[in-house]
Amino acid sequence: MFIIFYLFLNTSNTDVVIQWHESVSLSWTDFRGSVESNTDAVAVTASGITFSFSVKELNDEYVSFEVKANAHFYPDKSWYNKEKGNDHILAHEQLHFDITELHVRKLRYEVSKLEISQNIKIELRHLHDAINFDLAQMQHAYDSQTENSINYEQQLLWSEHIKKELKKYRTFRSQ
């Protein structure tokens, strides 16, 4: 069994998305993309962080800024093999989405520590890039250590770890 995770950094405004919410879990009906035939993958989850910011200027100086960041799941880019998909694999896919939300929370936390400066745009872009890098690294480590969901023990450990981390950053959760 093999599962692929895709991280989407740039997507079109016309893409159908599901925003992460703690009371809503993914279901197989959310995976609407076409199954790839040249792979051993059972499922593909496409998720990513949408990020934008605005900076208010007064007398040629930045005086305030606002940031928006969300964890999104892309149904039309996500798919699963109907003959092989099961609850265990769906839970593995959900955790990919949860890891994306965790990194949104980390991004919001780091943004909360920033102070307005004339370099704020650069700081925000660098922070976003760093969080996306960390997100990709964690997603890769997750699939590697769980052997794409095959290793049940590691899957459980990862599930507990992400649950703990989400709780740690709960102040910065998506609404």
Where are these predicted regions, by residue range?
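Bacterial Sec-dependent N-terminal signal peptides
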Residues: 1-18
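Metalloprotease/metallohydrolase-associated module, dominated by Zn2+-dependent proteases
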Residues: 15-63, 73, 116-175
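Envelope-exposed proteins and targeting segments
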Residues: 65-69
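Mid-length scaffold segments of soluble, non-membrane domains
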Residues: 72-108
